[in-house]
């Protein structure tokens, strides 16, 4: 399965936040939307990504205030991303190698989606369940 196919299934909604926004605002959005990361953008420019992990390590463990800390201060600036043509296996390999959980999807210079490790696993398990069901039907003569 490709990233494009996954985005068509789950929708291409990408929640973003400005680098100047507070970490508190970022965490509020993540909690409200039940997501683990936000893409940090300035206009149409991808600036970074901020995750729950960034919050835990760079704010909580350092005793900083989420209301006084900007996303720019703790975001991961070196963002790994994929294009819609990539396969989910390629995404999982990249996430595993780089020890990350979210990949923005870029097409023609524009942010068109985000893929999480959970999205990949759900899609792959669903495909495997379908294959198993088909094989069981075949074995039963159906």
Named regions from a protein language model:
Residues 1-47:
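A positional/architectural concept
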Residues 1-13, 51-81, 87-96, 117-142:
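Tandem CBS (Bateman) regulatory domains
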Residues 21-32, 61-74, 109:
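Short, charge-rich amphipathic segments
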Residues 17-34, 81-99, 106:
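The conserved cystathionine-beta-synthase
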Residues 30-33, 38-54, 95, 103-118:
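A glycine-centered beta-loop-beta connector
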Residues 77-78, 101-113, 139-142:
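Short flexible/disordered coil segments
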């Amino acid at each position: 399965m490709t990233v494009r196919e996954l985005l068509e299934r789950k929708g291409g909604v990408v929640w973003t936040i400005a680098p100047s926004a507070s970490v508190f605002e970022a965490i509020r959005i993540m909690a409200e939307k039940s997501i683990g990361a936000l893409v940090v953008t300035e206009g149409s420019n991808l600036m970074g990504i901020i995750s729950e992990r960034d919050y835990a390590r760079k704010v909580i463990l350092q005793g900083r205030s989420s209301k006084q800390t900007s996303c720019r201060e703790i975001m991961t600036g070196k963002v790994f991303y994929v294009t819609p043509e990539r396969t989910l296996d390629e995404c999982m390999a990249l996430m595993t190698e780089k020890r990350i959980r979210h990949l923005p999807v870029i097409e023609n210079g524009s942010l068109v989606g985000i893929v999480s490790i959970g999205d990949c696993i759900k899609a792959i398990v669903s495909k495997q369940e379908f294959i198993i069901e088909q094989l069981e039907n075949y074995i039963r003569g159906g």
